[in-house]
Amino acid sequence: MTLERMKRWQKIVLCILCLTALTVLANYLLQRFWAHRDGQFVPDYPRVELTENSDYDTIFLQTGLGRPAVDKLLADGNFQAILDAQDLFFNPPKGECTALLGWFTREDMLETPGPFLADIQPGDILITLSTHTIGWRHGHAGIAVEPDTTLECAVWGADSACFPAQEWTDYTNYAVLRLKDSPPETGQKVADYGLSTLLGVPYHLTSGFIGPKAPDPEAWQFGLHCSYLVWYAYQHFGYDLDSDGGRLVSAYDLLHSDLVEVVQIYGMDPRQFLKEEG
């Protein structure tokens, strides 16, 4: 190898090393700072004393508990759980950014669990915005198939599977949503369909984006990602939860669908949901 050619290769290697270093640095800055600019919400408004006669909006602003959860807790004679939720809503545990796929994809997790899940029914939708990739806070979604079990397509390289629902309280923020004005039987049908058809399906990031948005589940290329799993289960019964109608279904799309109501939120600003309802 001539001296000139050797110098040329040295420059190429040096450029590759510099680009790699810049990529790693950019990813670190995005994941460490940009992704956390709108992380866990802590109320910036006054805490008030709650009573069993407080209106739904006040309880929601103070605890993150929606009407379905409040009704259930009051019917169970468990007003103390509402007060406990208020404590954690205003004084959340410390969060930590942890690795899901190295520094590429990370999750913001609480050091100790947040409020317990007040009311989970089959078919309920669970969402967190704690998951972020290269600074993009895309979140994660799952569907309840039992009061204590969720069906999720959790991570690239793994098939959809069932997980303990209570693990959602480890996230720095989460939401429980339910189809509006529908009987429990509807949610049960969606949950049953998920278990019979969408369990053990490969993770495909481009699901619904390339090819038909809702292909036959028997198609050879059929796959899921977290939000698409939820959307696909509900579209089978005629409910399109994709709020922006695009090809890519995201956790944000599900969270802001007009077809769902809030059962419970934590680490999210309740005012955005009251504004949407208004």
Task: Set out the residue ranges of the language-model regions.
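Short amphipathic alpha-helical segments, especially helix-boundary/capping motifs
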Residues: L100, Q166-T169, P202-G208
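Short, structured beta-strand/loop micro-motifs enriched in basic residues and often containing a Trp
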Residues: L100-E111
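Glycine-rich catalytic cores of cysteine/serine-nucleophile enzymes that process amide/ester linkages
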Residues: I120-D181, I210-E218
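Active-site nucleophile-His-acid catalytic modules used for acyl/amide transfer and hydrolysis
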Residues: A175-G245
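Boundary regions of SH3-family modules and the immediately adjacent low-complexity/disordered segments
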Residues: E152-C153, G157-A158, F163, E185, ...
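Activation targets extended, charge/polar-rich intrinsically disordered C-terminal tails
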Residues: T2-L100, P217-G278
